[in-house]
């Protein structure tokens, strides 16, 4: 008769090593989950901040006035080497709108307005007033050329609609253009 051999004794050191290896793997999984959670939270906060800034820009900035200024109160200066983007006529990439009414002088007014927005330090109000003057001149020229009040009225309605759009929806494009054209000396971008 064969007597069964006793089960080999496991050394306490080997058991401890296996236990630690298992615990370390779980700790690593938890650390990875914790880091992923933290990253998700950070990205969520960044998205909320981006949406809030976009809403503020769209509505007229923090103070309700659409003004570009450095956060420390210093005056923005023209960005060295900045090249303005080519004017896009009467439209806004922000809203996916591009108007091609076929009136060259209208496109000229819109292009001048785009350039004004991209001139560092130029106020939105000044740019918009120049734009309104340019637009109203188009209608005066139509009246001189055609002499028909019907055409002038249609021109004035179109100009008024375009100008109202710029007044109410132009803050974000203005601020984006100023951010691109200007530099604030004491501001440095920092990532979270």
Curated annotation (Swiss-Prot):
One of its GO terms (cellular component) is Golgi apparatus. It is found in: Secreted; Cytoplasm. Its EC number is 3.1.1.4. Keywords: Calcium, Cytoplasm, Hydrolase, Lipid degradation, Lipid metabolism, Metal-binding, Secreted, Signal. It holds the Pfam family PLA2G12. Belongs to the phospholipase A2 family. Its cofactor is Ca(2+). GO terms for biological process: arachidonate secretion; lipid catabolic process; phospholipid metabolic process. GO terms for molecular function: calcium ion binding; phospholipase A2 activity. Ca(2+) binds at residues 91, 93, 95, 114. It comes from the Eukaryota. Binds 1 Ca(2+) ion per subunit. The lineage of its organism: Eukaryota, Metazoa, Chordata, Craniata, Vertebrata. The gene is Pla2g12a. Residues 1-25 form the signal peptide. It comes from Mus musculus (Mouse). It catalyses: a 1,2-diacyl-sn-glycero-3-phosphocholine + H2O = a 1-acyl-sn-glycero-3-phosphocholine + a fatty acid + H(+). The active site is at 113, 128. PA2 catalyzes the calcium-dependent hydrolysis of the 2-acyl groups in 3-sn-phosphoglycerides. Does not exhibit detectable activity toward sn-2-arachidonoyl- or linoleoyl-phosphatidylcholine or -phosphatidylethanolamine. This is Group XIIA secretory phospholipase A2. PROSITE patterns: PA2_HIS. The keyword GTP-binding does not apply.
